[in-house]
A protein has these predicted regions:
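Short hydrophobic/Thr-rich beta-strand motif most characteristic of the beta2 strand and flanking loop
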Residues: 25-32, 36, 40
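Two-component/phosphorelay signaling modules centered on CheY-like receiver
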Residues: 11-29
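Acidic catalytic/metal-coordinating carboxylates
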Residues: 32-33, 59-62
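Short amphipathic alpha-helix used as the core "switch/output" element in two-component signaling
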Residues: 39, 61-73, 91
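Active-site residues of response regulator receiver
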Residues: 8, 52, 81
Length: 113
């Protein structure tokens, strides 16, 4: 199946998404911040990235912009947040995000995306 990178500063979210995606047969790598996400992206190719918008070191929209301007936004990215506004979601899709998931994320929401 797919090789997926989950980027979220909340351990519970990373664990939940990893469990759901592994149960569906996907290979999952986890990153707790933008620094780890950059390293994971540099080390491997992903079929999909699930990227949290609000993280302590660099927010997900800034990381998305960084990947787009560097020409490494070669995979679909689904942005995630429990606090984002519609404007933030629209900005992310303009930059290149494929979709947006509002937290809390359920199995049905995730598999629909």
């Amino acid at each position: 199946m797919a090789n997926i990178l989950v980027v979220d500063d909340e351990l519970g979210i990373r664990d939940l998404l990893s469990e759901i995606l592994n149960d569906e047969g996907h290979s999952v790598d986890l990153a707790e911040n933008a620094t780890q996400a950059r390293a994971a992206r540099a080390a491997g190719m992903y079929d999909l990235v699930l990227l949290d918008i609000w993280m302590p070191d660099t927010d997900g929209v800034s990381l998305l912009k960084e990947w787009a301007s560097a020409g490494v936004l070669t995979m679909p990215v689904i942005m995630m947040s429990g606090h984002a506004t519609i404007d933030t979601a629209v900005e992310a899709t303009r930059i290149g995000a494929f979709s947006f998931l509002e937290k809390p994320i359920t199995l049905q929401k995730l598999l629909k995306a």
